Regions:
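Domain-level detector for secreted/extracellular nuclease and nuclease-toxin modules, and
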Residues: 2-274
Length: 274
């Protein structure tokens, strides 16, 4: 498992020092979003796009946080991730770590930190982006999957039914094809203007997930788009071309693929699941 990187706390410590100095000098409230965003941009962070699962956000890149089992870009304005990306291997699906169910503020998030109580009484689930079920191979990976930076307000029925069905299907594909690369996150398209909790976590309009199967036996890029509402529909009804999702999200998925290969896979409209 040499590919797994220990989380690098350099950016977290650097940000903490910047915030501490700035607060001492000015005494201003550094939880304000525009100030937080300025600090994030000042770090000049870059995600490792040589890794197959890492996307490129064309505008407004968030705070990059590297975890044991996934990487995310955190949106300080909406208090949710922009995207969460990870590789899931056949071996990792055989893990037996138990869920902790201990939702915690993310210690590396710059600025205001979402807490589990922001979701209390909201009517929304604490919806994992990188699922706990994909992190059973490591105690640390499991614990980190419960950081609130990996969570979005999600319709209960969607979280427990169709979204969960796709998580299980992804593990099935990882076992069948050796590994899969996954990116997912919320979609904000202006359809609703709803916030929850004292930290004003913005409720997504929808969610996307893209899955790359890049095996000698099978190669496919699957795009899924879920409205943030009850569904209970076949997963095939959520399929959408990856090209369409790139336009919706402003992201470039799987940029590590050769251009010709990437273009061919992403423009394909898949009508059925592998």
């Amino acid at each position: 498992m040499a590919r797994k990187k220990k989380k690098n706390s350099f950016f977290g410590w650097t940000a903490a020092i910047i915030i501490g100095i700035a607060s001492f000098i000015t005494g201003k409230n550094w939880t304000e979003w525009d100030t937080t965003q300025t600090l994030i941009e000042g770090l000049n962070q870059q995600a490792d796009t040589s890794r197959m699962e890492i996307p490129i956000k064309k505008e407004g890149q968030g705070q990059i946080i590297q975890r044991t089992g996934y990487t995310l870009s955190y949106d300080a304005k909406n208090k949710t991730p922009q995207w969460v990306a990870w590789e899931l291997t056949k071996e990792e699906t055989r893990g037996n770590e138990e869920r902790t169910n201990e939702f915690q503020p993310d210690p590396e998030v710059i600025g205001a930190k979402v807490v589990t109580y922001d979701y209390s009484g909201s009517g929304y689930d604490r919806g994992h982006m990188a699922p706990a079920g994909d992190m059973k191979w490591s105690k640390k990976a499991m614990q980190e999957s419960f950081y609130m930076s990996n969570i979005c307000p999600q319709d209960h029925n969607l979280n427990t039914e169709d979204w969960n069905d796709l998580e299980m299907k992804s593990r099935e594909w990882a076992r069948r094809y050796g590994k899969v690369y996954i990116v997912c996150g919320p979609v904000y398209n202006g359809g609703r203007n709803e916030y929850i909790g004292s930290h004003r976590v913005k409720v997504p309009d929808a969610f996307f997930k893209v899955i790359l199967i890049n095996d000698t036996k099978k190669q496919a890029a699957l795009g899924f788009y879920f409205e943030n509402e009850a569904g209970e529909r076949p997963l095939s009804e959520y399929l959408i071309s990856v090209d369409s999702l790139e336009k919706l999200t402003g992201m470039d998925f799987f940029p590590a693929l050769p251009d010709e290969e990437e273009n061919l896979l992403e423009k394909e409209i898949v009508n059925k699941l592998p």
